Amino acid sequence: PNIGSGSKLSFYLKEKHGIEVKIVTINEDEKIVKRFDEKSKIFYLSEMLTYTSRNFHLASQVAYIEANDVINKVIKDNNVESEEVAPLLKLSLLNYYAAAFMMPYNDFLKSAKLHKYDVEILMHHYACSFEQVTHRLTNLQRPGNEGVPFHFLKTDIAGNVSKRFSLSG
């Protein structure tokens, strides 16, 4: 239903940026997850990726093309000079852009409220994974236009925390 999914994203990359998307079979290259060849303007994605992972990688490529300069400026303007921190911050901001591109704030919040924050409906509507949707729900903290203050915690089967996120405190 929105530009942030599958074939629409591939079409967007082709029409707006001249980038062709090619799905790589395991027989062609079993090690590839994603790769962008700037010279040929081909973005390669593994056939082994789930549909939602492919979507996110496509949106991440859009983020890299459309927001890279702005993100670099944000990092520079905030004097982030650490060789360890700057790349992590850049990746986080690119991923945030990708999620926002797939699930635009106002549209996503309206849909979340309409469907009473039903994660499965939102997953279907935005062609995103459980983790992508729940992570985006934690981001809905725009002053004056907030969503429910969600907290995100990802653990492995043994209970080890591998990811935590909250913007609400």
Please provide the spans of the model-predicted regions.
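Conserved binding/catalytic microenvironments
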Residues: 2-169
